[in-house]
C-alpha cells in the first residue's frame, strides 16, 4: 500500500502488520495441530479422521499463505520460526 493509500484509509501499517503476524502465527499453529493429529490418530475411524484433519490442515495452510503474502505486500516480514509463532499468536494452546 502506497503512502497516499495509507493516508486515505488512515492506516497505521505497523499495527496492521503486528495483527497480521499474530493471525499468521495462529494459522501456523492450527495447521500444525491438524497435521500432527492426522499422523498420530488411532482407532476404527482412523481413515475418516485422517482425511478430515488433512482437509483442515490444507485450509489453514492456505490461510497462512494469504496472510504471509499480505504481510510482504505491506512491506513487513512474516514471523519466521515456531518460537516466534508462540510469542505472537493470539490463541494459546496447552
Residue ranges and their predicted role:
Residues 30-37, 41-83:
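Conserved alpha-helical segments that form or flank metal/cofactor-binding pockets of metalloenzymes
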Amino acid at each position: 500500500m502506497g503512502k497516499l493509500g495509507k493516508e486515505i484509509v488512515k492506516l497505521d501499517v505497523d499495527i496492521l502488520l503486528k495483527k497480521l503476524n499474530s493471525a499468521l502465527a495462529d494459522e501456523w499453529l492450527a495447521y500444525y495441530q491438524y497435521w500432527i493429529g492426522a499422523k498420530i490418530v488411532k482407532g476404527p475411524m482412523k481413515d475418516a479422521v485422517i482425511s478430515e484433519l488433512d482437509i483442515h490442515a490444507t485450509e489453514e495452510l492456505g490461510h497462512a499463505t494469504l496472510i504471509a503474502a499480505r504481510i510482504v505486500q505491506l512491506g513487513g516480514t512474516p514471523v519466521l520460526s515456531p518460537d516466534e509463532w508462540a510469542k505472537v499468536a493470539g490463541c494459546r494452546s496447552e
